[in-house]
Amino acid sequence: MARRQQPWATRTARDRTDAPARTQLLDAAESVFARRGYGLATIADITAEAELSRASFYVYFASKEEIFRVLAVRVRDAFLAAQEVPGVDLDDAAAVAEASTAAFISAYARHLPLLRLLEQQAQTDDDVRQLWEEIQERPVHRAARYIRRLSADGRLAPVADPLSVARAVGGMSIQFARLVAQRPTEYDAAVRDVTAMYLHLLGTGAAPCEPTGPRST
């Protein structure tokens, strides 16, 4: 008698990638890793957090190591998406700076516990190291290309090399995101202030932002 194939075994890679249960497991894994750390986290912890069976986990992931790497890819993509700024005129440097800064700070603050783990795991895992480097570098280089393009068109007069400006803005955004992770009420002020400094470095001549939100003391 032919062996009956389980329904899940016939799913395509696309089906598994798009499945709500997969997203549920990823969200649960991020929470568990943030709470317990990488070493102590188990697949049982993740499935319990997701309220799914252990068998469901193996439909989508082969191991704890794999789901951690998939999370790293998701975080990398979140930072790249932060620079997409849909609905914003890409020739409007001030609007792009504000929208991309807001999205970056939000994403970094939201994923901060996982980012700390990624940095640790990057010391011993080559795959995670590559993803960590992409998280650090790809948004910076994309921003630098944008600055170069507008500079070549005469729309910007950056105070330094575009790559240096992009690195400076990235560093400021990370520091403010860490503050926001501790004090979410500082989000609006963080976006306002980083945007103002970003525009100064771009040489846009934009007027300083007026204080409208809470400030740290």
Located regions from the model:
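Helix-turn-helix
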Residues: 20, 24, 28, 32-66, ...
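Short amphipathic alpha-helical elements of helix-turn-helix/winged-helix folds
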Residues: 28-32, 107, 142, 172
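Hydrophobic alpha-helical connector segments
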Residues: 70, 84-113, 162-169, 191
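Short coil/turn segments at alpha/beta junctions that flank glycine-rich nucleotide-binding fingerprints
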Residues: 35-39, 111, 153
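Amphipathic alpha-helical packing segments from all-alpha helical-bundle domains
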Residues: 77-80, 107-110, 127-153, 163-167, ...
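Hydrophobic/aromatic-rich alpha-helical bundle segments in the mid-to-C-terminal region
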Residues: 116, 120, 129, 151-197, ...
